[in-house]
Amino acid sequence: MFCPSIKPGLNYGGQFLPAEEIASHPEVDFVIVATVGKVGLGPTLAALRAGKTVALASKEVLVTAGEILVSEANIHHAQILPIDSEHSAIWQCLQGEKSKPHRLLLTASGGPFYHYSQAQLAAVTPEQALHHPVWKMGKKVTVDSATLMNKGLEVIEAHWLFSFPFDSIGILIHPQSIIHSMVEFMDGSLKAQLSWPDMRLPIQYALSYPERWANPGLPRLDWNKINSLDFEPVDYDRFPCLKLAVEAGKSGGTYPAVLCAADEVAVELFLSHRIGFTDIARIVQGTLEQHRRISRPSLEELLAADNWARECATWLSLGGNRKHERRDNPGTKR
């Protein structure tokens, strides 16, 4: 199934072109960025500067450099379309609305360990963390879902995608993952987007927008089998990664870039059995505490902060307890 405007046979003559060159190529009008970490930042910027429509699944790209990306999109009349199910849901709920909403509500499954005690969380193994109760994802995002870091990154994403203040973005635990997000309006009414948890739907919608394509391969909700839709408040104490992410987003500057980089290192260390599950938050927090924030960073300063954070997180994982100094820890606060 292809939209007529998609060119599945596009041929560049067998050359392997740099991702930035492909993303900004004159024959390309639609770019999907679905990478892990900062590797997608360069191609995303290149595409936006070339005025392309970018469907973004790489949350780290927007978290790290959201202000720069949104600015470039506005300058070059480019579009950023969300692929994440939660942001796609909000995007769909906002269509046709002229009034600014009162609040955005992101839902989270809670991951496999939401009702674990602190002692149980400390004993979680990589093998356990890689079994998500609802979604089938890559290793990094699956672990981030278990720590709820993923939901914190999505709060920062929502802030940039929808130009919405952090204090008006809420989170609800919704184990069934049927409601993907909700929007509350000034009159107290709510809109929600519901569907079976299947990433093919938000991906397809980004491709088909502003139309909707029929796809018999996508599962439908059977209301005869859905007995309840449950919700719980978020427990920030047992899942500190979520709180760290939201606070980093509110503080802004280079903090979100440092958050992403430190988390990426910590998750890799956990997956290789070198640190425990609860050490992920400890390392991320320690890295953020040692960082000297730049309030309005350039792209080069964001990349320097990313590199510094990776070194600091690695150093902390080895038992470092003194301040981690390095020349590219972005200078003095400003």
Model region roles, listed by residue range:
Residues M1-R334:
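Catalytic, metal-anchored helix/loop core of enzyme active sites in primary metabolism
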